[in-house]
Amino acid sequence: MATNPGLFTEWPWKKLGSFKYVLLAPWVAHGWYEVATKGWREVDLGYIAILPSLLLRMLHNQAWITISRLQNARGRRQIVRRGIEFDQVDRERNWDDQIILSGILLYLGALYVPGGQHLPLWRTDGAGLIALLHAGPVEFLYYWFHRALHHHFLYTHYHSHHHSSIVTEPITSVIHPFAELVAYELLFSIPLIACALTGTASIIAFEMYLIYIDFMNNMGHCNFELVPSWLFTWFPPLKYLMYTPSFHSLHHTQFRTNYSLFMPFYDYIYNTMDKSSDTLYENSLKNNEEEEAVDVVHLTHLTTLHSIYHMRPGFAEFASRPYVSRWYMRMMWPLSWLSMVLTWTYGSSFTVERNVMKKIRMQSWAIPRYSFHYGLDWEKEAINDLIEKAVCEADKNGAKVVSLGLLNQAHTLNKSGEQYLLKYPKLGARIVDGTSLAAAVVVNSIPQGTDQVILAGNVSKVARAVAQALCKKNIKVTMTNKQDYHLLKPEIPETVADNLSFSKTGTAKVWLIGDGLDSAEQFRAQKGTLFIPYSQFPPKMVRKDSCSYSTTPAMAVPKTLQNVHSCENWLPRRVMSAWRIAGILHALEGWNEHECGDKVLDMDKVWSAAIMHGFCPVAQG
């Protein structure tokens, strides 16, 4: 929102929410009616092509978002090395409003502008006219309009909304108040209307112009330099005809320079070009030599088939909210399956997120496999190779800690990471499975005054650590699985072993639950029971009517942890899993020991370190 919002700042269809697309429905329905009644030979192809054009533009914009987020996560060629937060993502979530507005104007033009009907596929003279009118009137008028927008009155009432984003993403380019974007649309319509009135319009030329505008807008705001220097060496005048991402980035950091739309020519002739433009461009290209140094690497993986859309490089709005299954995502199953196949064939981990806390630089890398892959025996060797390759690459890049998230630390897969330590005994990076902090979170989630709990579900390394800690606190732990009870009993110190017992039934109102707990067993719990998961994955909540469920082991992160603008799987905003935080603490504290295999660090020490650095228990709803 602008500093002091003026008239027509809000979009008129804001209250429609996701139903705003119905605004285009009458024209879309009319188009299909025309096809049904007249046939493809008689119908106006230009009118019919508007809907595919809008869909293509949305895909084009999404591609830029994904590429930009992947590139900026790696830190290569990055221009502004600062983070963004959730408020920017929320502010820019309505980027498709511009597509809807453009669609409405295109439909109106195709119906009512003279010469806008029954356009041919291509006319060279029309394409040339569009290029000339854009380079002349459009660029000239935009330059002076843009300068006017930086006048105090217009800036505070309108343009400050766009400049709220210092660190830009591709789609920042179309985040403006409604009135301002209407003015831009009218400006860009000059070449199109001129072609229609002169009888030189064509479908392909119009589409190329729209794609050109989207491409240049996205490129200018992507926050990484991608224009190679050899282009300007080969054709020097290009410097005045095409801006670069670093050129426009200076406009967002300096505000009073580099006003041009896409052609810096006007900044040169009116002496508003930032003097550091060339230097920033060259320095941004130099960042290509090597990826940004990293201290902590967290290895995660894809979960469900649709989880790829919820990762940071996916759909920004989905990534900014806890993962939930949405019915309409099922309609994207062809793309989901294609993504799975492409991911499965990809032979290396990829960077999905970059964070900074104090002087510690962190990255999250995703192993290109889904959760179901980890349950396939014939996939285990390939998955281990991928994790091993990632660990070695992180170590080569100077990482101090590699934390294993989700199923990447499964005991049946790699003995909680110990397999890599045995293979590479001189490994510089510390391997951390996060058991101590995960167990500490579970123990500290138990309400004060609790004297007995029930432990149900598969007994993992975390479950064993929790059981030992609770028995030492003289809290009675009742297990519901006899076989697991006999396996765990010898691991409890003799002095407190009586605190661990087996029973098919129990009266405790606190259940510590893990994977493998079925619905029937949950229904054996009393009303008012608190279920606290110790597993990586959330349990199926079948007792929401009378019981409550905690999140999987996690903590809220402090404000000093920056560039957090996506949710970690199903966790709330600015909440991270204990396994991920454990790696961060390892680096912050400078601990030199591994936590893998059967090794568990001192839970009290790890918990105290987490609290000291500002991590907080998650408030349960």
UniProtKB/Swiss-Prot annotation:
Main localization category: endoplasmic reticulum
Residue intervals passing through the bilayer: 99-119, 126-146, 186-206, 224-244, 332-352
PANTHER family with a match to the protein in the record: STEROL DESATURASE
GO BP field: anther development; anther wall tapetum development; cuticle development; cutin biosynthetic process; pollen exine formation; response to abscisic acid; response to salt stress; wax biosynthetic process
Disruption outcome: Male-sterile plants characterized by small and white anthers lacking mature pollen grains. Defects in the biosynthesis of very-long-chain fatty acids (including polyesters) in cuticles and in the innermost layer of the anther wall (the tapetum). Lack of epicuticular wax crystals in the outer layer of the anther and severely retarded microspore development and finally disrupted as a result of defective pollen exine formation.
Subcellular location: Endoplasmic reticulum membrane
Protein name: Very-long-chain aldehyde decarbonylase GL1-5
InterPro entries linked to this entry: CER1-like_C (IPR021940), Fatty_acid_hydroxylase (IPR006694), Sterol_Desaturase_Related (IPR050307)
Job description of the protein: Aldehyde decarbonylase involved in the conversion of aldehydes to alkanes. Core component of a very-long-chain alkane synthesis complex. Required for the biosynthesis of very-long-chain fatty acids (including polyesters) in cuticles, anther tapetum and pollen exine.
